[in-house]
């Protein structure tokens, strides 16, 4: 088994997926790092959501086994939580596809990389509409519960990832469906967070009334 470290990046250069070599402070790696960070935060959201809703206490190994079998559906969870976890896992897979597209600059190699489609964007819009059911009348402050708070971290990280991606468009062409998907993600996490908070929200006016 090869070692995890290669020492090839000790002088500030590293490889993209297509084999091209660039400086580590390249905008490419800002985008890839933001996507990676976002996926990690989504993973934490999945773990919190699972821990908050699991009905039967199992060993950690059994929990992991149950979580990944049957299309990520677990017999320990209610249908609503299973649905939410499945949505989040789908988004993580799409982020991997997006990262692969960004990391392949060579046009001759892009055909082998999974593409995001217009249907992927529409599916994300359907999920936004699914959870955006209570009209919003004023600005909100995060922190109703753990899942809500973690979801807002996902929201703010997705916005940063989108900003980085638009900076990348100054150097290379980025697929329009990827840009649309990244734009929708922050909206999804906002509507999703409101559902996770059971629409019990901390409004700015509530804080002002206290002070």
Segments predicted by a language model, with ranges:
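Phosphate/pyrophosphate-binding loop motifs in nucleotide- or prenyl diphosphate-using proteins
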Residues: 1-211
């Amino acid at each position: 088994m090869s070692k995890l470290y290669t020492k090839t990046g000790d002088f500030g250069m590293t490889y993209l997926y297509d084999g091209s070599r660039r400086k580590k402070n390249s905008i490419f790696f800002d985008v890839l790092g933001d996507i990676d960070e976002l996926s990690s935060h989504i993973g934490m959201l999945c773990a919190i959501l699972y821990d908050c809703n699991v009905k039967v206490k199992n060993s950690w190994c059994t929990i992991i086994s149950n979580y990944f079998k049957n299309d990520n559906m677990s017999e320990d969870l209610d249908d609503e939580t299973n649905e939410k976890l499945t949505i989040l896992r789908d988004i993580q897979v799409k982020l991997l596809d997006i990262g692969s597209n960004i990391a392949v600059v060579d046009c001759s190699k892009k055909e082998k990389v999974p593409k995001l489609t217009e249907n992927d964007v529409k599916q994300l819009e359907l999920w936004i509409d699914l959870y955006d059911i209570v009209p919003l009348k004023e600005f909100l402050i995060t922190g109703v519960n753990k899942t809500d708070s973690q979801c807002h971290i996902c929201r703010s990280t997705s916005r940063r990832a989108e900003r980085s991606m638009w900076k990348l468009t100054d150097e290379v062409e980025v697929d329009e469906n990827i840009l649309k998907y990244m734009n929708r993600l922050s909206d999804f996490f906002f509507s999703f967070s409101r559902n996770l908070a059971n629409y019990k929200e901390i409004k700015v006016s509530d804080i002002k009334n206290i002070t």
